[in-house]
UniProtKB/Swiss-Prot annotation:
Plays a role in cell envelope biogenesis, maintenance of cell envelope integrity and membrane homeostasis. It is found in: Cell inner membrane. This is Inner membrane-spanning protein YciB. The keyword S-adenosyl-L-methionine does not apply. HAMAP family: YciB. Its main location: membrane. The gene is yciB. It is a multi-pass membrane protein.
Length: 193
């Protein structure tokens, strides 16, 4: 599989474990948190399969973001299963989004003044340093919002948590991405247009 094809399907592969989780969550009957424990087992297995496949397809490497997802899924999924308590798996998504927000916020300090978003999108868009910094803060805000939403659904609106985790955050992300690329279309590098 060539790199362009792999880059195109990566976002879809990322959702497979969540879809497996949601399916098992909705189709398993049980008392208390039994359905969440079963869904967490499915999530762990699907995560290891999907990211194992990505590891092979990406020439035996994973991106930092992918490692973060795998490690946090294994840690929080493992704690959920070990203690038979869904509290731990509900922590995963808010923590992942908070780490992304924090990482982008701190990126100029560790990348010689270059915002992390510029490192990721620089090959596609041409902007001034000030514009890159603003865009970086927009993404920090987005990941902060996602962390807050995930925490609210995980601990306040618990009955909707699985639905939001599987589909709601995907909808928020797609709307954000469409808005971003609509705004950024004027900054696309001329050699890409």
């Amino acid at each position: 599989m060539n790199a362009k094809t792999l880059d195109a399907i990566k976002p879809f592969l990322d959702w497979i474990p969540l879809i497996v989780f949601f399916y098992i969550y909705k189709t398993t009957e049980g008392e208390g948190s039994e359905h969440i424990i079963a869904a967490t087992t499915g999530l762990l297995i699907a995560t290891l399969i999907v990211y194992g496949l990505m590891f092979v397809l990406q020439k035996f490497t994973l991106e930092k973001r992918q490692w973060l997802v795998v490690v946090l899924t294994v840690v929080f999924g493992g704690l959920t299963m070990a203690f038979q308590d869904d509290f731990y798996i509900r922590l995963k998504a808010p923590i992942i989004n908070a780490v992304f927000a924090f990482g982008l916020a701190m990126s100029p300090l560790f990348l010689g003044g270059t915002p992390g978003i510029q490192k990721m999108l620089g090959p596609i868009f041409e902007m001034t340093p000030k514009q890159w910094m603003k865009l970086n803060w927009v993404w920090v805000g987005f990941f902060t919002l996602m962390a807050v939403l995930q925490a609210l659904f995980a601990f306040v609106w618990v009955e909707y948590w699985a639905m939001f985790t599987a589909f709601g955050d995907m909808i928020v992300m797609v709307v954000f991405m469409v808005a971003q690329f609509w705004f950024l279309r004027g900054f696309m590098r001329k050699d890409i247009k």
